[in-house]
């Protein structure tokens, strides 16, 4: 029967009545759209049966069959062709069913066939299935187009094989989406002898039973993309991509493809010379999952591209002749013991090992500026290595001892090695790069301490072992520190300077490593001649941070420390008639510059501190004597700079603190007559501290100081005239200080503990001053003083259990010069300049100004 022989025709089976079910049986050939336009509608349970059927028979014809609703069926015992030479459309929906022995979409040149299978329960059942027939004329334009759309839960069941793009110059396309399913019992050919594509998205399902092929002939260009969460392709046997032609398989955005079983399945790329087979794991977003045992590359151009922005595990083994690229910004973690030949290029993101042997020992690796090769703490062997990016040795859990062996040559294109080292002595556990060939170029090394406490070294801790010519330059990026010690990178061991390797040493020699000018000659073995001359032990190199910690401790102990006259000036200026006050308030400011000498004979320490302190007091007359009792508070800040005299590295210390205290002073006499005094004070200080070493993180911690002082003096007149008297006042003072500090764990991992710094300091001195007797106001009372401070505060810092002392000189000698001034009724001021000096180049210069008002 022919529908649409020359003019438009319509056959409607089923109508619109509920439960109606027109039936039509045709034992011959059914043609819809022979030379004109024809259409068949099968709905509402209508049934159609035929032996053979063609939709869109001749050139220029248009045929269409629409079958919908549950119970509607079309049965073809032999073949069903949609688009023979013309244009054909078959639309199956809403639970309808169609079956055919053989099914073809776009059978010949000029044909165009479209199949749509839509809806839950909608089924197309076929034997052999073909999409895109085409022509045997190799010079013809691309024609013979077929397209199948399966979505919304629709199902296509193919008991035979399925061929997409089966004849030259044809084009076959399949789209499976939103829960659509295509089940193929035998082989799926995508691009059998022409162009074909399959796209599975949004939870679509594709199943094939026997080995499947993508680009199965030299004329074929074909691709399969499985994309989106829930989208899968399950192949029971194996998949061949680009066996003879140009084929690509893309798995992305959470999709999954299985090729055989994870134990013995495989995916084959590029079967013969001249073919191209590409596996794309991702297209820049999320990756997909490939479940198979191996990805094999054969004789042609086989490539695997990892182009994703997420973290993804890849478990199949990569083997054979393959070129591998890591493109996207994400991380690929490998669990196969890969042995492929060909290049590995990491252009972006991270190429990471999940097991030992994950990186192919037969592949030359190229790490571009945006890429990272991550050993994850697992030993690896590779071919040659060109590093313009990052090679990371440690695992996420830390630790050290990972080795990367480069069987060929190594070239550093300004790249970086991230290495963990348990920084200690020569035998410290360390990550290591072993190059069996030659080295060239420039490479930076960043070292992270893996729990080492620091130690003196002799030969050094080897990081790079070079078997060939060692013309490459390795530079330490940042710093390598542990405990008290600083490590630097040197070429050659201390006793084997020409061995070509690179070593970390804590060595105080102020000689920088020398850049090599050419290949180094390996040392000759000993010949039993003259005995070796013993080499003296290496002096370890101290880092400057201990000086900053000690400087902060010293600043905290000394910031608010002083004498009674430092604090309130000359009380006698308040005691003349007309100036006597019951109450008083005062303020003083002090600035000091302290050089505490070299710590460990390597680190110079300088501290600048500024203080403002104020107080209020009340006077009590007790018999012939008087007592001043008051409160005081203060704020101060200090900056310390520790500079290594060997490495010139610096560490900055900062202290800012607040102080509160009480004091009481007893004077033997109420008047200005000379006599004795006793001063007692207690003080509590609290400090915020910072230490910031060059190229290290900023450390913060708190500290506290409690101190008490008792001081006594007696003024004796030594000469007098009608206008002036001169007095000498011997003095003695005892100060107790108790320093406490939080522990610090630095970003480098070093544990820092500051000593308590408690102890007694004594002062013995004398003050010589003159006093005007004219009775005029605005008197000036100059003075000079000398003091001997003894005992001092024992400063100490322990870093990873190793202590470094910063004890001040036991004897410090001080000289002062200044004056007190009477400014007016109740007002007085004082100023002074002081200099302290002790052993170990200790120097302290300070000056202060004070102002007091009594009423």
Predicted regions and their residues:
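Surface-exposed loop/turn positions within long extracellular repeat scaffolds
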Residues: 24-28, 49-50, 74-78, 97-103, ...
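Outer membrane beta-barrel transmembrane domains
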Residues: 661, 747-855
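Periodic glycine anchor positions in long extracellular repeat architectures
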Residues: 2-4, 9, 22, 31-33, ...
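Feature marks extracellular polysaccharide-active and adherence modules
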Residues: 4, 14, 33, 43, ...
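Extracellular beta-solenoid/beta-roll
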Residues: 289-290, 299, 307, 313, ...
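Residue-level detector of the transmembrane beta-barrel scaffold of outer-membrane proteins
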Residues: 89, 418, 584-588, 628-632, ...
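Outer membrane beta-barrel translocator domains of Type V secretion systems
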Residues: 520-720, 832-835, 839-846, 852
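Outer-membrane beta-barrel domain signature
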Residues: 54, 80, 104, 137, ...
């Amino acid at each position: 029967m022919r529908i649409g022989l020359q003019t438009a025709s319509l056959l409607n089976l089923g109508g619109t009545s509920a439960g109606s079910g027109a039936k039509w049986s045709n034992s011959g050939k059914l043609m819809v759209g022979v030379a004109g336009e024809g259409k068949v509608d099968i709905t509402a349970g209508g049934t159609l049966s035929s032996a053979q059927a063609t939709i869109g028979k001749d050139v220029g014809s248009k045929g269409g069959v629409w079958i919908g609703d549950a119970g509607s069926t079309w049965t073809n015992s032999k073949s069903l062709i949609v688009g023979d030479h013309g244009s054909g459309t078959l639309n199956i929906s809403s639970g309808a069913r169609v079956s055919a022995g053989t099914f073809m979409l776009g059978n010949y040149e000029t044909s165009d066939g479209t199949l749509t299978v839509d809806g839950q329960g909608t089924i197309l059942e076929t034997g052999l299935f073909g999409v895109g027939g085409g022509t045997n004329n190799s010079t013809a334009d691309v024609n013979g187009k077929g397209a199948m759309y399966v979505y919304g839960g629709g199902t296509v069941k193919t008991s035979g094989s399925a061929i997409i793009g089966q004849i030259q110059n044809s084009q076959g396309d399949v789209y499976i989406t939103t829960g659509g399913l295509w089940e193929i019992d035998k082989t799926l050919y995508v691009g059998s002898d022409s162009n074909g594509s399959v796209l599975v998205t949004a939870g679509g399902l594709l199943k094939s039973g026997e080995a499947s092929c993508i680009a199965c002939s030299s004329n074929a260009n074909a691709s399969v993309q499985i994309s989106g969460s829930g989208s899968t392709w399950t192949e029971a046997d194996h998949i061949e991509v680009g066996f003879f032609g140009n084929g690509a398989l893309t798995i992305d955005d959470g999709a999954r493809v299985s090729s055989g079983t994870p134990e013995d399945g495989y995916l084959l790329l590029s079967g013969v010379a001249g073919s191209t087979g590409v596996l794309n794991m991702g297209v820049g977003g999320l990756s997909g999952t490939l479940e198979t045992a191996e990805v094999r590359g054969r004789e042609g151009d086989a490539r695997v591209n990892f182009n994703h922005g997420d973290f993804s595990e890849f478990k199949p083994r990569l083997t054979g002749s393959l070129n591998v690229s890591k493109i996207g910004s994400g991380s690929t973690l490998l669990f196969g013991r890969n042995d492929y030949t060909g290049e590995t290029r990491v252009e972006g993101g991270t190429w990471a090992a999940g097991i030992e042997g994950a990186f192919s020992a037969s592949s030359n690796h190229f790490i571009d500026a945006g890429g990272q090769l991550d050993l994850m703490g697992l030993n690896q062997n590779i071919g040659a290595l060109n590093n313009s990016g990052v090679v990371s040795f440690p695992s996420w859990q830390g630790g050290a001892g990972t080795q990367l062996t480069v069987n060929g040559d190594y070239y550093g294109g300004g790249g970086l090695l991230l290495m963990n080292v348990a920084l200690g002595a020569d035998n410290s556990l360390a990550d290591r790069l072993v190059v069996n060939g030659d080295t060239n170029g420039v490479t930076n090394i960043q070292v992270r301490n893996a729990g080492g406490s620091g130690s003196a070294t002799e030969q050094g801790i080897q990081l790079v072992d070079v078997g060939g010519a060692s013309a490459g330059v390795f530079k330490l990026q940042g710093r390598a520190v542990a405990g008290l010690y600083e490590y630097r990178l040197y070429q050659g061991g201390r006793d084997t300077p020409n061995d070509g390797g690179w070593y970390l040493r804590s060595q105080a020699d102020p000689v920088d490593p020398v850049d090599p000018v050419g290949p180094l000659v390996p040392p000759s073995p000993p010949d039993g001649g003259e005995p070796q001359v013993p080499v003296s032990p290496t002096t370890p190199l101290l880092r400057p941070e201990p000086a900053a910690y000690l400087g902060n401790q010293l600043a905290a102990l000394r910031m608010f420390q002083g004498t009674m006259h430092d604090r309130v000036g000359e009380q006698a200026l308040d005691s003349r008639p007309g100036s006597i006050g019951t109450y008083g308030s005062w303020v003083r400011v002090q600035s000091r510059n302290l050089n505490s000498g070299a710590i460990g004979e390597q680190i110079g320490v300088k501290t600048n501190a500024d203080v403002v302190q104020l107080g209020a007091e009340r006077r009590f007359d007790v018999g012939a004597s008087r007592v001043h009792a008051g409160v005081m508070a203060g704020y101060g800040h200090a900056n310390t700079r520790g500079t290594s005299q060997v490495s010139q590295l610096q560490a900055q210390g900062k202290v800012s603190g607040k102080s509160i205290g009480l004091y009481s002073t007893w004077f033997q006499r109420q008047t200005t007559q000379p006599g004795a005094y006793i001063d007692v004070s207690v003080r509590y200080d609290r400090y915020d501290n910072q230490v910031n070493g060059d190229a290290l993180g900023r450390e913060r911690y708190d500290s506290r100081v409690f101190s008490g002082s008792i001081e006594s003096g007696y003024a004796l007149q030594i000469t007098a005239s009608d206008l002036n008297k001169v007095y000498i006042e011997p003095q003695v003072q005892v100060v107790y200080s108790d320093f406490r500090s939080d522990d610090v764990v630095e970003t480098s991992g070093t544990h820092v503990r500051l000593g308590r710094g408690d102890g007694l300091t004594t002062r013995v001195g004398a003050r010589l001053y003159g006093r005007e007797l004219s009775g005029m106001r605005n008197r000036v009372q100059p003075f000079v003083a000398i003091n001997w401070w003894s005992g001092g505060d024992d400063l100490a810092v322990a870093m990873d259990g190793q202590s470094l002392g910063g004890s001040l000189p036991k004897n410090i000698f001080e000289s002062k010069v200044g004056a007190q001034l009477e400014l007016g009724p109740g007002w007085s001021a004082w100023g002074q300049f002081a200099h302290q000096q002790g052993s170990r180049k200790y120097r302290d210069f300070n000056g202060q100004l004070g102002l007091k008002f009594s009423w």
